[in-house]
């Protein structure tokens, strides 16, 4: 077989596409629009590794398919370029982050273009461009004017390495999400956004979104809506009441002590003199801990205040303790403890010898462990004999009638700590005037540009490095024209990504952030693709900003992203010696893949599948893959590795197989005889239509690996024919095009099949031909045959499910049960699992 220079073909076709503006879409669509968005990358100095393009390849397949289906496709790319890594690099090297960011963007753009992605580069944006962050600042001002941004000196998560505050969402297992350093608690003046005012809507509007259920669950859990009751406890000998929130008002008769947060404002007033020293010491210890450390259920600490509360349902005096597992920022900062029916309260009570009263009947009792299940109420006066839900309602009614409480809803979600004490971020457009107070910068003076400085070192005092630039800080108050100072904190890395999908629609507009008519026609994003790690960071923040803009009348739709899909992580093999040292691929003899050895010594190495990292020497650079195999093999292999959403290891044997397939396709495409006069067979025509249906459905469902399999089957049949009907030749190239655009476009052109393949209509299946093929399927419910159906061979999975659910006997055995899953075994069986 003649050696094929795929790299030459790649460059040729990419230039043709770019010269002819094939992926540029008018700002106002003419045909039905399809807005496909990738989560834009942070342009790091390391460039792309093979894991990054997985999502980009999926979106590109979808985009090319939609273009061929007649849509005006919006498919932009840009750069989320503010953030700590560029600033840290500037500190280490003395090179301004603006310079390194530009260089990194140039490299990322080159790498992405080399993959043949169908991006509309006329829409390119960069969050560090003043023409972009002018509008980020403008949106902040709208949030401020709406009363949703405020200053507060609060205990925050402080990273001593990054020397900046972090939002709760940026802390993972008590460590900084960015650098892994253990977080400290520190009181610092911050700008905070009232995301909590949107908690209900952020929760309710998840309904109807086509998002992965796991992501919806993460957002629901992060918002953490709790429905229960607020209860007022009198404090013995004091006028003040202690207010608590509980999701279990039915257990009030089992409340045997109370716990308040060490930060609770009432603590100092109620602590008895003999306990003041112990309480003060405990408060100091708690102040040094992070919220994560305080949540460690294995470390139960606390101090008795000497004070007592009165249980409002039975008049009993119960002790008031302080413990750091109660957080001031959640609920009321105080809890009623029911140790018989809460594991943490139980362990605390056991440690400190506090009373435990069973109020929900259990077979085992509560001598050895708390009972957290449902049951009948006992030892609870008027609630005795009731079930939990009934007793909750009865207790809330009692509290309301007595004037000591009532129904209440709370949220786990906290307001968003928005400011950062670093240089490389958007300046917050606020001025501090000794006379006028906090004053917004006039919109006509935006953008407030970052000053060029030579020292980016964070101060570590809670002040941004900008505080050390007096010529920038000192300004004039927009209201009174007196001396004033600029806000020196900067915005977090999430600010620019909160609204970038809107700017892509109208990136050059200098009058507004997006033309209203364009926004109405092009929003929302029809398909958003990116990592699941952003579920409670970017995705939550972006939805919040969008809802503010919706309330202000700037956007038409309530939600920004109609459909969301996550790619799985691409892992890689690492090779490690017995001494624990990792070795790079160039050091390893892989002639026997089952027994990797060190080239220099022959030492046997341990092979593991791990996340790519420089320290493990298993990062695979796409430039190397492209140089060896070309873009189409790279793209197609990433889609063929396994289910899109699953994690899977990069395997050089796999890409070799795809490369061989594409070489066969190209050689066949160059040499095979093809003409309209060549006759087809019914079997081949049926296979053609089946393949069209299969590939189309699989692209829509992100089942790219099975689409590739279907294409391989179709090709194997075509490659056995000496004279291929032109209809089949064109169909195969068109179906393969989204996966391998370069060689298909090249063959399309060389065989004079017509104008650009990417602008050719997507093939249509002969449905009448497929309808002649009916098949019978058995139906099982929980493993037992309950019926059968006859469907057409072209029926989609959804059509098969719908017909199976309507089969009378199947319907009978599903009645009153929850559907768990449906497994369709092609041409044989439908297995329905219910519970």
Curated annotation (Swiss-Prot):
Family annotation (PROSITE patterns): AA_TRNA_LIGASE_I
Record field: catalytic activity: tRNA(Leu) + L-leucine + ATP = L-leucyl-tRNA(Leu) + AMP + diphosphate
Molecular function in Gene Ontology: aminoacyl-tRNA deacylase activity; ATP binding; leucine-tRNA ligase activity
One of the Pfam families matching this protein, by short name: Anticodon_1
GO biological process, one term: leucyl-tRNA aminoacylation
Gene Ontology, cellular component aspect: cytosol
Subcellular location: Cytoplasm
Broad EC category: ligase
Annotated ATP binding sites: 614
Protein family according to the UniProt entry: Belongs to the class-I aminoacyl-tRNA synthetase family.
Xref: PANTHER family: LEUCINE--TRNA LIGASE, MITOCHONDRIAL (PTHR43740:SF2), LEUCYL-TRNA SYNTHETASE (PTHR43740)
Protein name: Leucine--tRNA ligase
Organism: Elusimicrobium minutum (strain Pei191)
Gene this chain is encoded by: leuS
